[in-house]
Amino acid sequence: MRKVIHIGLPKLSEEELIEIGDIAQRVIIDYIFEHLAKSEVRDMEVTARINQGETLDLELEVYVEVPIFVRVDVESLIDEAIDKAYEVVERHLRKLAKGKGNEGREEAEEASGKSK
């Protein structure tokens, strides 16, 4: 079971959303190739879909095809790679939320005439 964690994100720009998808894809690909040689992977497809409404939804879809002689539980490997990607993306989003939160606080302090 997965629980939902409210990070309290500000509105993200298109570039930030693209970066999140890129990070997730890169983590998955790196994880797969940490466990399999490139020659053992016949085909791989990693898709990230991001929807930002009231919440930020990230859907990751991974397909990996290996030859029959490669002894690996592909489904478990994919699940582990996806879990790792979600962990990395969550850390990245927390940094974004913290950074933007601090920027907003600094702007508010400057507007009110207070400084650190």
UniProtKB/Swiss-Prot annotation:
Pfam families attached to this UniProt entry: DUF3194 (PF11419)
Biased composition (Basic and acidic residues): 100-116
Name of the protein described by the UniProt record: Uncharacterized protein PH0533
InterPro entries: DUF3194, MTH677-like_sf
Similarity comment: family membership: Belongs to the UPF0440 family.
Superkingdom of the organism of origin: Archaea
Region (Disordered): 97-116
